[in-house]
């Protein structure tokens, strides 16, 4: 007879699950900051609406699809951070994971957003063609994303 041992996958024993949960929570935190900074500045830089519009155009599902795409993007970034950036960072210097998360957020916004996405969309480097507030808005959003990412990933170790 063959014994098959089953193992329950939980937040505590699965890096993958922990990284996915971290990506979801970090994206939700990003969204909270996004809608707060939109309300404060009046600059309509809603990434979910933009992603939805670029994907399906104007429809009743634009916002929902945009949020799903943004959530999947956040999960993908969490997996990149957890499996690639974090192991590399730990070899360089030992800092709290939440610090690595915030550094990841800064690097991500500079490379992918300021010099990638925004110029490709015609918004200029760092989105300065939209409004002077855009660089700070996007920087704060991504630092919060990285902070929450680091907090959730390091939570298991406590």
List each language-model region with its residue ranges.
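Juxtamembrane/disordered regions of integral membrane proteins
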Residues: 2-158
């Amino acid at each position: 007879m063959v014994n098959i041992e089953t193992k329950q996958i939980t937040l505590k024993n699965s890096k993958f699950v922990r990284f996915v949960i971290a990506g979801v929570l970090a994206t939700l935190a990003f969204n909270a900051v996004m809608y707060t900074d939109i309300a404060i500045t009046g600059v309509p830089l809603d990434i979910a609406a933009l992603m939805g519009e670029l994907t399906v155009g104007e429809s009743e599902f634009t916002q929902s699809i945009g949020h799903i795409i943004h959530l999947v993007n956040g999960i993908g970034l969490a997996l990149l951070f957890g499996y690639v950036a974090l192991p590399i960072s730990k070899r360089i210097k030992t800092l709290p994971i939440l610090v690595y998360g915030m550094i990841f957020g800064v690097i991500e916004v500079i490379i992918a957003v300021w010099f990638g996405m925004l110029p490709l969309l015609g918004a200029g480097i760092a989105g300065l063609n939209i409004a002077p507030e855009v660089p700070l808005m996007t920087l704060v959003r991504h630092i919060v994303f990285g902070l929450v990412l680091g907090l959730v990933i390091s939570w298991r170790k406590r």
